[in-house]
Amino acid sequence: MLRWLTAGESHGPELIAVLEGLPAGVPVSPDAIRADLARRKLGYGRGSRMKFEQDALEVSGGVRHGLSLGSPVALRIGNSEWPKWVDLMSPEPIAAEKLAGARGAPLTRPRPGHADLAGMQKYGFDEARPVLERASARETAARVALGAVARSFLGELGITLVSHTLSIGPVRVPEDAVWPTPADVAALDADPLRCFDRATSARMVAEVDAAHKDGDTLGGVIEVLAYGLPPGLGSYVHWDRRLDAQLAAALMGIQAIKGVEVGDGFLTATRRGSEAHDELVAEDGAIVRQSGRAGGTEGGMSTGGVLRVRAGMKPIATVPRALRTIDVATSEAAPAHHQRSDVCAVPAAGVVAEAMVALVLANAVLEKFGGDSIGETARNLRGYLDAISQNLATERVSAPYA
């Protein structure tokens, strides 16, 4: 079983991430993790923080000479901006005069759409700073780092992932657009909005420009695809063991995500049954699904087809034009607190979603096949696939459906 935890605040000295349960012998490359951390900063419409904030990665446990040891993997991501926040975020008590000034002023105007007000109510804070520091999407850097390790584990078993942007605001790729594959990651990362359709990407850029001009923000939809999965990950026997339920929970746990669908999801709900499911045919001695409408899961289990999950991100709640709120120190109406923010962070959300899907799939693989070393896990996987009787055999799909 794979377990992961993160710790740290947005403007604290560092983020800490721990991954427990990873088998020994998995390649763990600090450079590969840094590359994913850089991908998390991609996207047209990002704020100034992405330009000056550096992620100083350090692998502090669980890895020796580039390979996992089977013990917990510990990662640290230093915050290059920490010197500016030493007093405000100090773990030690600080004299009031050291907190004087704009940066140290209490944040008593909770921002609509953020965790501010509910967090203040829940934890008994009289200002929003303690809430927003942990609720911030900065925390996702730690999960992206862990996801890079999980993806390396999956890659050793022939499982690969890719994410891309389906929509920004009202601008959406056509429903019949070609699915990207992991071979397209470089091209996607080079696109301003990580969109696989160039014409749609250009219209997305224009939409971001318009929102920026209006002092507004945008959300959108991203999609993660996983290729090469074996059938049978997850289970139908209990609700919490269903793979699609675990994926939905992981994606909903990403900041600003408000909806998740698997495969064609809500579109499937508009179809008749004769047009909603993936028919089975025999080809070259194997059972083949003619389409991928279900998104690679049936009955809470992977089918061996392409896994396809989507997540809808709401527009960023820190709106430059400032939404209305109440100053809880005076009980009077006031504009919400505004700090530098993005116009659109949907492309980055795709990278975070990719990491979360990788972690969930890695856990599902270990739950099914176990193994204290990557070699043992791989042997168990091969033995399982070999044991499936010939009349039930399906192919592990490593390319989009025709």
UniProtKB/Swiss-Prot annotation:
Cofactor(s) it depends on? FMNH2
Catalytic activity from the UniProt record:
5-O-(1-carboxyvinyl)-3-phosphoshikimate = chorismate + phosphate
Disulphide-bridged cysteine pairs = none
Annotated NADP(+) binding lies at R40, R46
Record text on cofactor binding:
Reduced FMN (FMNH(2)).
Q: Does the keyword Flavoprotein apply?
A: yes
Provide GO CC annotations from the record: cytosol
This chain's function reads:
This reaction introduces a second double bond into the aromatic ring system.
Assembly information from the UniProt record: Homotetramer.
**The protein, known as:** Chorismate synthase
Which lineage do the record's taxonomy fields give for this organism? Bacteria, Bacillati, Actinomycetota, Actinomycetes, Micrococcales
